Structure formats: structure tokens, C-alpha cells
């Protein structure tokens, strides 16, 4: 009988999780269509010929809104499992979550005071 300890399972998972993307990328490279003409290298704009240059500058405020969104989206990802297991975690986990939320509220107030949330 062959018995695996915890490290062999980890090693097997590491090998499989490394081989799957490598095999998928290799298969896609081998099976993709080769060549193509100049039509393949043009940008796609709703089936119409592109007009003008593609290098336009976006307002920096788009990036600020996106950054604030990502911060609070990550907050949700961290707080959801905590809320699901709230009854089993105890007081220490509650205090840690409050500290985490307080840091994010301070970051929100800082972004608000700096004008990152205003569009003018």
C-alpha cells in the first residue's frame, strides 16, 4: 500500500498546475493558423475601416476611478469569507477586520480630500 503524506499531494498539485498552462500554451501555438495577410494585422473597429490614429489620450481621472474601484473590490473579496465564517472566528478576527476596514476608510478619505473622486 502506498500512502502519501501532505507534501506529496502538494508536489503533485504543483506539477499538474504547472503542466496544464504549459500544455495549453504549447497546443495553442501548434494549432493556430499560420500566416495571414495584411488584413489580419489591421485593428478591428466594428467591421469598418479604422479612421485616424489609435493613440488617443485618456483622462487620468479614469485611472483614479479604476484604482479606487480595484481597492474596494479587493476589500470585498477579503471581507466576504470573513463574513461567512464570522461565528467561528471569534473576537480577534472581528478586531482584525475592523482594523482592515479602518485602513480602507482612511484611504477613501485621503482620496476624497485629494480630489480623486471629483470629476471636474
UniProtKB/Swiss-Prot annotation:
Keyword rRNA-binding in annotation: no
Keywords of the record: Membrane, NAD, NADP, Plastoquinone, Quinone, Thylakoid, Translocase, Transmembrane, Transmembrane helix, Transport
Function: NDH-1 shuttles electrons from an unknown electron donor, via FMN and iron-sulfur (Fe-S) centers, to quinones in the respiratory and/or the photosynthetic chain. The immediate electron acceptor for the enzyme in this species is believed to be plastoquinone. Couples the redox reaction to proton translocation, and thus conserves the redox energy in a proton gradient. Cyanobacterial NDH-1 also plays a role in inorganic carbon-concentration.
Gene Ontology molecular function: any one: NADH dehydrogenase (ubiquinone) activity
Record's protein name: NAD(P)H-quinone oxidoreductase subunit 3
Membrane-protein topology: Multi-pass membrane protein
Oligomer and partners: NDH-1 can be composed of about 15 different subunits; different subcomplexes with different compositions have been identified which probably have different functions.
Compartment(s): Cellular thylakoid membrane
GO cellular component, one term: plasma membrane-derived thylakoid membrane
Gene3D superfamilies: NADH:ubiquinone/plastoquinone oxidoreductase, chain 3
Parts of the chain that traverse the membrane: 2-22, 64-84, 89-109
GO biological process: photosynthesis, light reaction
Catalytic activity of the protein: a plastoquinone + NADH + (n+1) H(+)(in) = a plastoquinol + NAD(+) + n H(+)(out); a plastoquinone + NADPH + (n+1) H(+)(in) = a plastoquinol + NADP(+) + n H(+)(out)
Record's keyword annotation contains Signal: no
Major location (coarse): membrane
Enzyme Commission identifier(s): 7.1.1.-
Alphabetized InterPro entries for the sequence: NAD(P)H_OxRDtase_bac/plastid, NADH_UbQ/plastoQ_OxRdtase_su3, NDAH_ubi_oxred_su3_sf
Family that this chain belongs to: Belongs to the complex I subunit 3 family.
EC class: translocase
